[in-house]
């Protein structure tokens, strides 16, 4: 176990930071909520900016690795998934047989998702729940899969959210997380840092009139645990068969784990 793992994976750490700014633990959730209320209508544009448009390919890879079955009794919980982007991809991959529950703490994000579900004819297959990832309002062993994309780094107490994920999964259930990660190629890292810290906040100001929100999102990526450290956190929460796949030079990573 590395010192970084000990700091973040066991004792916590991100609950005391808002990007690179140190804050009181009680402030974190409300500050993150403010960011996502402000970017909800432009969320896909935000991910396009943060990922150079690659998030769509990464999300397709996530759903392909999940490989949802075309079964009406198969249930997925998509956490921090308010706009429905991941849930809708999963439902379409299941030939519109599965059922998705989209959970988000942010009402503005959920509002966008509900409109999209109606527009795409997926409302009958989708429930939207406003709740906290750290305190899921579901019984034990309720879901076959738990997904979260670009959301776990915004949860104040990540370890608690992982314990809740483990609790609500059925035995044999799958955890799958897509998150920005620690770039492993030196040249790419320099280019991505230049893009992240010097270009993205300016684009955020121009496109969404909110450079500060985009600056937080960039900084939160840098504060998130490295791939191996996050794997340790999943093991610590009780998961087995933990693994990850780096995407595009590790700009992002897909983390997989099972409840055995």
Curated annotation (Swiss-Prot):
Residues that hold S-adenosyl-L-methionine according to the record: 83, 104, 132-133
Record keyword Methyltransferase present: yes
GO BP term, pick one: aerobic respiration
Database matches in PROSITE patterns: SAM_MT_UBIE, UBIE_1, UBIE_2
Protein name as annotated: Ubiquinone/menaquinone biosynthesis C-methyltransferase UbiE
Catalytic activity: a 2-demethylmenaquinol + S-adenosyl-L-methionine = a menaquinol + S-adenosyl-L-homocysteine + H(+); a 2-methoxy-6-(all-trans-polyprenyl)benzene-1,4-diol + S-adenosyl-L-methionine = a 5-methoxy-2-methyl-3-(all-trans-polyprenyl)benzene-1,4-diol + S-adenosyl-L-homocysteine + H(+)
Annotated EC: 2.1.1.163, 2.1.1.201
Family: Belongs to the class I-like SAM-binding methyltransferase superfamily. MenG/UbiE family.
Pathway membership: Quinol/quinone metabolism; menaquinone biosynthesis; menaquinol from 1,4-dihydroxy-2-naphthoate: step 2/2; Cofactor biosynthesis; ubiquinone biosynthesis
Molecular functions (GO terms): 2-methoxy-6-polyprenyl-1,4-benzoquinol methyltransferase activity; demethylmenaquinone methyltransferase activity
Alphabetized UniProt keyword annotations: Menaquinone biosynthesis, Methyltransferase, S-adenosyl-L-methionine, Transferase, Ubiquinone biosynthesis
The species this protein was found in: Bartonella quintana (strain Toulouse) (Rochalimaea quintana)
One Pfam family this sequence matches: Ubie_methyltran
InterPro entries linked to this entry: SAM-dependent_MTases_sf, UbiE/COQ5_MeTrFase, UbiE/COQ5_MeTrFase_CS
Top-level lineage group: Bacteria
Gene3D superfamilies per record: Vaccinia Virus protein VP39
UniProt-listed PANTHER family: 2-METHOXY-6-POLYPRENYL-1,4-BENZOQUINOL METHYLASE, MITOCHONDRIAL, METHYLTRANSFERASE
Task of the protein: Methyltransferase required for the conversion of demethylmenaquinol (DMKH2) to menaquinol (MKH2) and the conversion of 2-polyprenyl-6-methoxy-1,4-benzoquinol (DDMQH2) to 2-polyprenyl-3-methyl-6-methoxy-1,4-benzoquinol (DMQH2).
């Amino acid at each position: 176990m590395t010192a970084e793992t000990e700091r973040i994976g066991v004792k916590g750490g991100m609950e005391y930071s808002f990007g690179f700014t140190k804050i009181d633990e009680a402030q974190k959730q409300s500050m993150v909520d403010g960011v996502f209320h402000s970017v909800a209508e432009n969320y896909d544009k935000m991910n396009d900016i943060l990922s150079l448009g690659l998030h769509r390919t990464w999300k397709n890879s996530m759903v392909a690795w999940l490989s949802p079955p075309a079964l009406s009794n198969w249930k997925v919980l998509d956490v921090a998934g308010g706009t429905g982007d991941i849930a809708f991809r999963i439902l379409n991959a299941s030939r519109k047989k599965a059922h998705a529950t989209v959970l988000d703490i942010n009402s503005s994000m959920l509002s966008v998702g509900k409109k999209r579900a109606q527009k795409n004819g997926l409302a009958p297959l989708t429930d939207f729940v406003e709740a906290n990832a750290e305190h899921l309002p579901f019984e034990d062993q309720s879901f076959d899969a738990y997904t979260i994309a670009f959301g776990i780094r915004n949860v104040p107490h990540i370890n608690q959210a992982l314990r809740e994920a483990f609790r609500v999964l059925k035995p044999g259930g799958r955890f799958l997380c897509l998150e920005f990660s620690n770039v492993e190629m030196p040249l790419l890292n320099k280019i991505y840092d230049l893009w992240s810290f010097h270009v993205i906040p300016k684009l955020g100001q121009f496109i969404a009139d909110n450079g500060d929100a985009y600056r937080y999102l960039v900084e939160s990526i840098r504060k998130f645990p490295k791939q191996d450290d996050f794997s340790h956190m999943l093991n610590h929460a009780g998961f087995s068969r933990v693994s990850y796949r780096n995407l595009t030079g590790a700009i992002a990573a897909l983390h997989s784990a099972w409840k055995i």
